[in-house]
Curated annotation (Swiss-Prot):
This is Phospho-N-acetylmuramoyl-pentapeptide-transferase. One of its GO terms (cellular component) is plasma membrane. Its cofactor is Mg(2+). NCBIfam families: mraY. Catalyzes the initial step of the lipid cycle reactions in the biosynthesis of the cell wall peptidoglycan: transfers peptidoglycan precursor phospho-MurNAc-pentapeptide from UDP-MurNAc-pentapeptide onto the lipid carrier undecaprenyl phosphate, yielding undecaprenyl-pyrophosphoryl-MurNAc-pentapeptide, known as lipid I. InterPro entries: Glycosyl_transferase_4 (IPR000715), PNAcMuramoyl-5peptid_Trfase (IPR003524), PNAcMuramoyl-5peptid_Trfase_CS (IPR018480). It holds the Pfam family Glycos_transf_4. It is found in: Cell inner membrane. Keywords: Cell cycle, Cell division, Cell inner membrane, Cell membrane, Cell shape, Cell wall biogenesis/degradation, Magnesium, Membrane, Metal-binding, Peptidoglycan synthesis, Transferase, Transmembrane, Transmembrane helix. Belongs to the glycosyltransferase 4 family. MraY subfamily. The gene is mraY. Its EC number is 2.7.8.13. HAMAP family: MraY. It is an enzyme of class 2 (transferase).
Length: 348
């Protein structure tokens, strides 16, 4: 194990701890001012759930809770990038682009939801097109950073190590599609997970920590150092956000936070060629998104529901399990997924 992390010496680990600490304390310090500002702007959660009267009734106590708290993630992550990453590197500005683009998309969606008063943001098609554009720009930029490196056409397969996907046009096309699915899919999956107090922030800590281990165990990746710094900050701000987002939540991250987190996590996985590992590390996100896909597919094809309600966490709410118990059980599942993902990544 020590040889795996030999490239990252004690001073580097100290730097990552510093990044984590700064992100954590900055999030704690800015939390209350941001919440107060959101309240003044009337950024309150819209509890209206069309065709989901029971869910609306279950969440009535959340109607006076401000949302769009994900702006904290934007502030802290941008601060981290400008403090710790060299401004002369293309990768630095790629992270700036990721944070601003995903954060802006989420913020705009939250604004539209607020104005329409019905809990509906921009249409699914509009959001999907914007996500594809952001992801395509990200992938092309990553390709230019790798500059034709052999590592660009590799893939970390769980329990099998790094394998080549080929340098042919077909291989590169496969890479592009997989990368696109990873970024867009993770962004939407985290967005779907953000439905209970503390659920998305807590599971983000685990997935990001697992991905950080992947970065530290693959020092030859061109972006491993930059990714490890950003992930350390993401873990720090996620922990800090839990102070205000755990039950009973004082603020919700909204799409501003969930789309940003998913976009950054997915992009970091692509930078590390760890798209398949993220399926394990973010197992909770996969289950949440999968439950929605299965539910929609079953309703359209069979005219029957598989779950009482989707995403998955609402299914358990419908069964009468308290919100805090559902979150606790999903935390346990997230921890197990993280451990399994780390083992799969380090298995040589």
């Amino acid at each position: 194990m020590s040889s795996v992390f030999s490239y990252f010496n004690e001073s580097w680990m100290l730097l990552l701890a510093t990044v984590f600490g700064l992100a954590f304390f900055l999030g704690i310090f800015l939390g209350r001012p941001v919440i107060s500002w959101l309240k003044k702007q009337n950024h309150y959660d819209q509890v209206h759930k069309e065709h989901c009267e029971k869910l609306e009734a279950l969440h009535q106590d959340k109607k006076n809770t401000p949302t769009a708290g994900g702006i904290l993630f934007c502030i802290v992550l941008l601060t981290t990038v400008f403090l710790w990453l060299p401004l002369g590197k293309l990768s630095t500005w790629l992270f700036v682009f990721l944070i601003i683009s995903w954060g802006t998309l989420g913020w705009y969606d939250d604004i539209i939801k607020k104005e329409r008063k019905k809990g509906h943001g921009i249409t699914a098609k509009q959001k999907f097109v914007i996500q594809l554009i952001i992801s395509a720009i990200t992938i092309v930029t990553i390709f230019s950073i790798y500059k034709g490196s052999a590592l660009f056409c590799t893939l970390q397969v769980p329990f099998f190590g790094t394998v080549s996907v080929g340098h042919s046009i077909l291989g590169k096309f496969f890479y592009f599609v997989l990368a696109m699915l990873t970024i867009v899919g993770t962004s939407n999956a985290v967005n779907l997970t953000d439905g209970l107090d503390g659920l998305a922030a807590g599971t983000t800590c685990m997935s990001a920590l697992g991905l950080l281990v992947v970065a530290l165990s693959n020092p030859t990746m061109p972006l491993a150092q930059d990714v490890s710094i950003v992930l350390s900050a993401l873990i720090g701000i996620s922990f800090a956000f839990l102070k205000y987002n755990r039950a009973p939540a004082q603020v919700f991250m909204g799409d501003t936070g969930s789309l940003l987190i998913g976009g950054v996590l997915g992009s970091c996985a692509v930078m590390l060629r760890a798209e398949l590992l993220l399926i394990l590390l973010g197992g909770v996100f996969v289950a949440e998104a999968g439950s929605v896909i299965l539910q929609v597919g079953s309703c359209r094809l069979r005219k029957k529901r598989i779950f009482l309600c989707s995403p998955l966490h609402h299914h358990y709410e419908y069964k009468g399990i308290s919100e805090t118990k559902v979150v606790a059980r999903f935390y346990i599942a997230g921890l197990l997924c993280m451990i399994l993902g780390i083992i799969a990544a380090l298995w040589r």
